Amino acid sequence: MSNRSRSTLLTISFFVLIDWVTKLAVLLYRGNLPNANPILYQYSWGKLFFCICPTFNEGAAFGLFSKYKYFLLLIRIVIILGILAFLFLRKKKTSATTRFSLILLCSGAIGNVGDIFFYNHVIDFISIGYNRWSFPTFNFADIFISLGTLIFVYKLYFPTKQKIK
């Protein structure tokens, strides 16, 4: 295994581990609390707020397509395999930025697919908001997917110029 492949595998494993450990910590802390969706931690800065409150999502982003759970799982697995094939089998060198964005995407997808296999749903627990508005609850895998997508799209629309030798 090449150094690049080894570092890619270790980086993916590291991000997946961050996601799974935080979810496990939230579940263990939640324990057998009587409330279905307890607030485990809450902090406010004026009208801005942050809270840790575990929720369970059986669909895609924002709970969309929850009726098609197994179809979504299949699509997610195909995407993961496609990204892994690109990262490990591509002979032509990929830019570090593109590679990192794909590592983030793959790590987040693996994190959420692991939830589906272990718990039969995705565990979301981070909630942020302003005043009475709140963003849908998310997790670290979602952060990795969002960052990976932003970096990938940025790289597509603003490619670096090749130096002429």
From Swiss-Prot:
Name of a matching Pfam family: Peptidase_A8
Enzyme Commission code: 3.4.23.36
Catalytic residues as annotated in Swiss-Prot or TrEMBL: D124, D142
Uppermost EC category: hydrolase
Subcellular compartments: Cell inner membrane
Transmembrane segments: 9-29, 69-89, 100-120, 133-153
Catalytic reactions on record: Release of signal peptides from bacterial membrane prolipoproteins. Hydrolyzes -Xaa-Yaa-Zaa-|-(S,diacylglyceryl)Cys-, in which Xaa is hydrophobic (preferably Leu), and Yaa (Ala or Ser) and Zaa (Gly or Ala) have small, neutral side chains
Keyword set, alphabetical order: Aspartyl protease, Cell inner membrane, Cell membrane, Hydrolase, Membrane, Protease, Transmembrane, Transmembrane helix
Cited InterPro entries: Peptidase_A8
Entry GO terms, CC: plasma membrane
Principal cellular location given in the protein's record: membrane
Membrane topology type: Multi-pass membrane protein
An individual GO BP term: proteolysis
Protein name listed in UniProt: Lipoprotein signal peptidase
